[in-house]
Amino acid sequence: MPKVGMQPIRRQQLIQATLTAVDQVGMGDASIALIARLAGVSNGIISHYFQDKNGLIAATMRHLMNALIQNVRERRQALTEDSPRAHLQVIIEGNFDASQVSGPAMKTWLAFWATSMHHPSLHRLQRINDHRLYSNLCCQFRRTLPLEQARSAARGLAALIDGLWLRGALSGDAFDTEQAQRIAYEYMDFQLAKSAS
């Protein structure tokens, strides 16, 4: 009989083991057996909690997405001003937070993006994540720009964030958070300056 209260602990163990496995060998070779071994549990535990590898991958991605949401939320709560610029900055900072740019997180995101093209449930998660970023950016740009300009600025900044993140992930070097933020801030400021003209 399983111990009461073990489910959240086991689930977290398996998610961390998945991040480690993908970091070490990639998504394709991150087998149920390897993930279970890294977590120190039997293979059957994965089936018990997640049904299969895709269920575990989806849970791992929800974990990364929730970390992103939480990081942005905490930064928003710490804001001392309510300007669109301040809110856009925390969205940028959250997307380049250490929880999103560590080696295991970056490799898992990359593998997830590739896998999501072939698995409807993972594709749905990807679309939710994309829409959340775009709508949060658009909401802030809309506070100072006309609707079409706000939409365009949001699409551009979302693409820039993803592009900077992707180039950083593929570089093989440590992610340069300061540089990525600086470039994103420059684009943000360029777009916000349009409201004054």
Swiss-Prot record:
Record-level GO BP terms: glycine betaine biosynthetic process from choline; negative regulation of DNA-templated transcription
Keyword Phosphoprotein belongs to the record: no
Superkingdom, natural source: Bacteria
UniProt KW keywords: DNA-binding, Repressor, Transcription, Transcription regulation
Pfam families: TetR_C_6, TetR_N
Residue span, HTH tetR-type domain: 8-68
This protein's record includes keyword Transcription regulation: yes
Pathway(s) served: Amine and polyamine biosynthesis; betaine biosynthesis via choline pathway [regulation]
InterPro entries assigned to the protein according to its UniProt record, in alphabetical order: BetI_C, DNA-bd_HTH_TetR-type_CS, Homeodomain-like_sf, HTH-type_TetR-like_transc_reg, HTH_TetR, Tet_transcr_reg_TetR-rel_C_sf, Tscrpt_rep_BetI
Gene3D superfamilies: Tetracycline Repressor, domain 2
GO molecular function, one term: DNA-binding transcription factor activity
DNA-binding region positions on the chain: 31-50
NCBIfam families: betaine_BetI, PRK00767.1
Purpose: Repressor involved in the biosynthesis of the osmoprotectant glycine betaine. It represses transcription of the choline transporter BetT and the genes of BetAB involved in the synthesis of glycine betaine.
The protein's name in its UniProt record: HTH-type transcriptional regulator BetI
Organism expressing this protein natively: Pseudomonas savastanoi pv. phaseolicola (strain 1448A / Race 6)
Taxonomic classification: Bacteria, Pseudomonadati, Pseudomonadota, Gammaproteobacteria, Pseudomonadales
Gene from which the chain derives: betI
